[in-house]
């Protein structure tokens, strides 16, 4: 023993709690004795809560941190009975669990074996009554632990729930209390001074302070009432000067201020209290301007009337009462300038990349300014904020070195106003200048904003000015030229270009319509592509090559979508134009080509994302594409290509794309979308053409998406037969993979798919089902096992699991019926090496309840156990033809248990004699066989323990390696992956153990039968001795009978009584001798039949073992090699 009490002579398990329970040499001593006894007696009624191994090794009990000596959690796990009992939960049928009434919510309250309570709900465990603190721990995994110790039943499995913390908490993983105290809750409530000043309005003050509302509500109601004759001017639609409207508003504002003043006068009701209240508010918010709040309150209540008056005045151009109410931007003017381009406004920007920047600013500014037309914008401050934001968008310098001067700003603002097409924009500006709180002239920036808009209005208010005429003419020329492109009028375009060439030659003016771009930033070249006008596109490029420089072409893009010419050409599928653009791109440097191809649009997509429109282009530009670049949906170009399910040449598309992508540096994980789908998940067909499965590394064929679907389950779910066939042949495939969320396996998805398929898809579904079942029978089941269990569901009416069998016969049976058939078989064949029902179903007792999260997982293991049972039956010589009949899986009915017992008894009562010599031979044979079987059993038990421990230690090794990598990343200031606490996976040893345990169970069964017969032999000898003794006594009576024969008719009464007593004694001896002789005959018959049966079963055992062990090794090799292939270790030399 080590100093700390832990065993030093056994292979320690890395998790201290599991090591204490399953690998404890002191299990028969306190404090472990009672715990071990409870677990051993009803191991299926308990579930062990397992904290992370690293946490137990490296953390302390939080309660001990305040004391002078800290207590490590691993010491509690080894020595503290309460800690151990607190992590063992009663989940059996007698655990008194309170389940949630809603089935979708997996929640239940359970008691630990020390009387504490936990709540299991929605993947979390919450500590409750009895625990020192209210904590919560996340459930990270569940599983079964195969026991290998001698003090638990052989082959027993214990349910484990893995969590991310201990139920005592830990020093490295602090958890807050579930419910805050009332004081803490009160502290979270915002105090008045925490309310932002900007969010305070006068209306809010009225709601929050009833005293203030009581003082001013009635006067304000009268002020804003429609019958208020004093301000009737605002309610009559007559032509009037704008100053009159402004004056009426000012008067109402003064009335509002007076209402506030009157409310705080000492002679008014509650005046003093109202005054004190307002002073208290102002002290709490020193930055609050009460006059501003009142102004905004009046403005909100009068907005509808004010705005209606302004609209009426600005609409009456024929009978204007005020020159300031002139409507400049009419619908006609907007139409006249609708095609105006930025290059035609004397903006000193020639570089195409800077022009793109300005066009994008204009587009964003148009969106912002268009908010003025929103009917919910009813305050001058909101309107001012909109035009202020518009100016800020145009002048921002965050991503550009371009400086915007005043003249440039006016030009940009003209574009914004003209293309936003806001009706009555003049009224909006007038409202801002005349109805806002304060004076604009006091703020220099606001004055600059307003003056900028005034300048735009001035420039566009004089249609007779040459500047406006030029803009109108330019807009008209743009419209006519773009219309020619869209209508494919090549002859007219040719004549127009010839005329332009004669007029300007190589040097086009900056404001020429050939260089014009619409509000989306689309040039004539872009419009030609959009309209699929190849002739015009070629004509524009070839008429005079000096008109469009290489920079003009490379930076020609739709500024709203950021799509360049090549992207649009691919989208429009204009292959000839695409080819021309590729030729032009070939004249650039390699760096320029890569930058152009991988520049992204508004959705984050590059040219590579659109190559599926012309997949032959991949061979030319594939080497330039960044295939790992993700768009906003996390699609890489390769991922996007694979999703083109309706492509006319999908196979060629996939083959071409993967031939360009696949290389030794190909990273499979990079091509995953935000839902966790890999390329294998979304590939419709052509998996062989892709060559993905031929890659030696980086390909995880078992990866799951956010819905816990693997590529295999996706192919089954969506009927992708071609991919399914190819994937089933891959050595890395985990065919029986179960997701960690619902524990569905491939057979569940086959069942789901079969139920969802309609009549048209039924043939496809049946074909998929056939492939899945055939693969399972080929790789997981021996040839002679023709029927296995695939699915099950719980029947609430029968309170039993209904099992679905598939094979030569498709049968549905209840689990209880299967167990009864097994029991009947054992009654009929008491000496069969097939174990008893209790041994086979040791871990799955009848009516055994488990935690809700364990239900599906436990059912999967039960089906697994049932199939292994069927496999073992198929390897028994007596069941070569139909092993499934043993469990009642045949069409013929089984006889009852009573009939089976009568048949066995009748067989045993048949006459048969065994001589002592024969008996000695039988005894010698059985004794020698028992000795050999015990030696084999001892070796088998050791081997099974080794298999179990080996699988656990492999998991421990992997856990230690992950913990080491986590610590190393923390030391290197890297972002480590989240530490996990998962169930030990199967490294192949668990699979081998599941079959080798049957060798152990059959040996135990044969030895038990041998011991039973040896006991019968002892009974036979004792009975034989009694028969000989009784026969000797009978001979003595018969000899004395002749001596007493002469006195038989004596009249002496006393002498006659003696003779009568001897006769009675003689009769009793005869009867006793007859009974013992009959019993001896039965024993002889039973021993002979049992001997023959056991001898046959020993022969069957040798044949059974010779078949089972190679099959078990084959399954071990399959699981182990699958893991090696999955991890890429098969390439190591």
Curated annotation (Swiss-Prot):
Residues 324-469 form the VPS9 domain. This is UPF0507 protein PGUG_02975. Signal peptide: none annotated. One of its GO terms (biological process) is early endosome to late endosome transport. InterPro entries: Ankyrin_rpt-contain_sf, UPF0507/Ank_repeat_27, VPS9, VPS9_dom_sf. One of its GO terms (cellular component) is plasma membrane. It comes from Meyerozyma guilliermondii (strain ATCC 6260 / CBS 566 / DSM 6381 / JCM 1539 / NBRC 10279 / NRRL Y-324). GO terms for molecular function: guanyl-nucleotide exchange factor activity; SNARE binding. Belongs to the UPF0507 family.
């Amino acid at each position: 023993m080590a100093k700390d009490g832990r065993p030093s002579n056994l292979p320690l398990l890395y998790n201290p709690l599991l090591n204490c329970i399953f690998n404890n040499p002191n299990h028969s001593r306190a404090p472990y004795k009672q715990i071990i006894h409870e677990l051993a007696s009803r191991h299926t009624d308990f579930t062990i809560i397992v904290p992370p191994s690293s946490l137990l090794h490296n953390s302390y009990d939080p309660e001990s941190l305040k004391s002078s000596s800290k207590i490590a959690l691993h010491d509690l796990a080894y020595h503290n009975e309460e800690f151990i009992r607190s992590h063992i939960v009663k989940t059996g049928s007698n655990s008194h669990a309170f389940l949630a009434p809603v089935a979708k919510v997996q929640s239940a309250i359970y008691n630990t074996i020390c009387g504490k309570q936990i709540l299991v709900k929605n993947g979390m465990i919450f500590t409750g009554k009895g625990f020192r603190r209210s904590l919560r721990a996340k459930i990270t995994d569940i599983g079964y632990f195969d026991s290998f110790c001698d003090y638990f039943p052989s082959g027993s499995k214990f349910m484990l729930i893995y969590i991310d913390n201990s139920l005592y908490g830990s020093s490295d993983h602090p958890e807050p209390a579930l419910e805050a105290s009332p004081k803490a809750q009160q502290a979270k409530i915002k105090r008045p001074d925490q309310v932002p000043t900007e969010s305070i309005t006068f209306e809010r003050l009225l709601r929050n302070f009833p005293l203030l509302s009581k003082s001013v509500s009635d006067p304000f109601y009268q002020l804003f009432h429609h019958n208020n004759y004093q301000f009737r001017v605002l309610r009559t639609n007559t032509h009037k000067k704008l100053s009159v409207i402004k004056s009426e508003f000012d008067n109402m504002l003064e009335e509002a201020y007076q209402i506030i003043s009157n409310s705080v006068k000492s002679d008014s009701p509650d005046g003093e209290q109202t005054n004190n209240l307002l002073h208290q508010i102002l002290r709490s918010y020193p930055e609050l301007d009460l006059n501003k709040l009142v102004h905004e309150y009046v403005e909100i209540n009068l907005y509808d009337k004010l705005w209606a008056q302004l609209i009426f005045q600005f609409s009456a151009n024929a009978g204007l009462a005020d020159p300031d109410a002139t409507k400049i931007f009419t619908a006609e003017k907007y139409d006249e300038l609708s095609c105006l381009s930025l290059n035609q406004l004397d903006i000193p920007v020639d570089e195409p990349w800077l022009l793109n920047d300005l066009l994008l600013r204009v587009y964003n500014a148009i969106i912002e300014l268009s908010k003025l037309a929103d009917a919910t914008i009813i305050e001058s401050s909101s309107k001012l904020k909109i035009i202020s934001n518009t100016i800020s968008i145009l002048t921002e310098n965050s991503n550009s070195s371009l400086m915007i001067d005043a003249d440039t700003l006016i030009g940009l603002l003209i574009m914004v106003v003209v293309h936003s097409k806001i009706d009555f924009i003049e009224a909006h500006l007038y409202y801002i200048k005349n109805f806002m709180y304060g004076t604009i002239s006091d703020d220099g920036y606001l004055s600059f904003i307003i003056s900028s808009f005034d300048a735009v209005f001035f420039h566009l208010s004089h249609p007779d000015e040459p500047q406006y005429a030029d803009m109108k003419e330019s807009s008209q020329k743009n419209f006519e030229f773009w219309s020619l492109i869209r209508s494919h009028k090549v002859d007219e375009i040719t004549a127009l270009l010839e005329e332009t060439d004669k007029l300007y030659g190589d040097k086009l003016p900056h404001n020429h319509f050939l260089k014009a771009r619409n509000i989306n930033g689309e040039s004539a070249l872009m419009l030609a592509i959009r309209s699929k006008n190849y002739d015009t596109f070629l004509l524009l490029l070839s008429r005079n090559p000096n008109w469009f420089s290489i920079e003009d072409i490379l930076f020609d893009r739709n500024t709203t979508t950021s799509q360049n010419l090549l992207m649009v050409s691919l989208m429009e599928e204009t292959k000839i134009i695409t080819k021309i653009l590729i030729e032009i791109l070939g004249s650039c440097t390699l760096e320029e080509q890569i930058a152009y191809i991988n520049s992204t649009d508004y959705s984050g997509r590059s040219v590579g994302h659109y190559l599926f429109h012309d997949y032959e282009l991949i061979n030319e530009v594939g080497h330039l594409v960044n295939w790992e670049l993700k768009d906003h949906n996390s699609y890489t170009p390769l991922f996007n290509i694979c999703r083109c399910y309706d492509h006319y040449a999908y196979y060629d598309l996939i083959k071409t794309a993967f031939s360009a992508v696949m290389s030794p540096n190909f990273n499979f994980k990079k091509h995953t979308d935000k839902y966790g789908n890999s390329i294998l998940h979304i590939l419709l067909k052509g998996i062989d053409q892709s060559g993905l499965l031929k890659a030696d590394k980086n390909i995880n064929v078992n990866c799951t998406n956010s819905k816990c679907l693997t590529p295999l389950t996706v192919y089954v779910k969506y009927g992708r037969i071609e991919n399914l066939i190819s994937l089933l042949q891959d050595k890395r495939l985990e065919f029986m993979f179960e997701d960690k969320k619902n524990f569905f396996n491939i057979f569940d998805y086959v069942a789901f798919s079969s139920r969802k398929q309609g009549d048209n898809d039924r043939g496809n579904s049946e074909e998929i089902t056939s492939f899945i079942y055939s693969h399972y029978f080929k790789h997981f089941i021996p040839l002679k096992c023709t029927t296995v269990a695939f699915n099950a569901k719980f029947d609430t009416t029968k309170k039993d699991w209904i099992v679905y069998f598939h094979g030569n016969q498709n049968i549905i049976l209840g689990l209880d019926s299967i167990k009864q058939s097994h029991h009947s078989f054992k009654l009929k064949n008491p000496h069969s090496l097939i174990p008893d029902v209790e041994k086979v179903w040791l871990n799955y007792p009848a009516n055994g309840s488990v935690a809700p999260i364990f239900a599906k997982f436990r059912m999967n293991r039960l089906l697994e156990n049932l199939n292994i049972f069927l496999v073992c039956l198929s390897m028994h010589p007596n069941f070569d033809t139909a092993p499934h009949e043993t469990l009642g899986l045949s069409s013929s009915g089984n006889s009852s248990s009573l009939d089976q017992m009568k048949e066995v008894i009748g067989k045993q009562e048949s006459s048969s004699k065994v001589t002592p010599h024969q008996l000695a031979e039988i005894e010698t044979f059985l004794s020698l066989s028992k000795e050999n079987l015990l030696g084999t059993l001892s070796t088998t038990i050791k081997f099974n323990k080794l298999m179990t421990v080996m699988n656990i230690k492999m998991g421990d090794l992997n856990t230690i390696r992950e913990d080491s990598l986590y610590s190393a990343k923390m030391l290197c200031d890297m972002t480590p992956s989240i530490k996990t606490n998962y169930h030990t996976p199967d490294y192949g040893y668990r699979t081998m153990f599941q079959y080798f345990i049957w060798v152990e169970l059959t040996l135990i069964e044969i030895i038990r039968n041998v011991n039973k017969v040896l006991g019968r032999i002892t009974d036979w000898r004792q009975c034989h001795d009694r028969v000989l003794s009784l026969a000797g006594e009978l001979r003595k009576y018969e000899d004395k009978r002749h001596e007493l024969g002469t006195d038989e008719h004596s009249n002496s009464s006393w002498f006659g009584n003696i003779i009568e007593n001897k006769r009675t004694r003689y009769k009793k001896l005869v009867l006793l001798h007859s009974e013992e002789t009959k019993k001896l005959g039965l024993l002889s018959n039973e021993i002979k039949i049992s001997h023959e049966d056991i001898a046959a079963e020993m022969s069957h055992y040798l044949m059974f073992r010779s078949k089972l062990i190679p099959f078990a090794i084959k399954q071990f090799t399959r699981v182990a090699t699958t893991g090696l292939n999955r991890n890429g270790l098969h390439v190591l030399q």
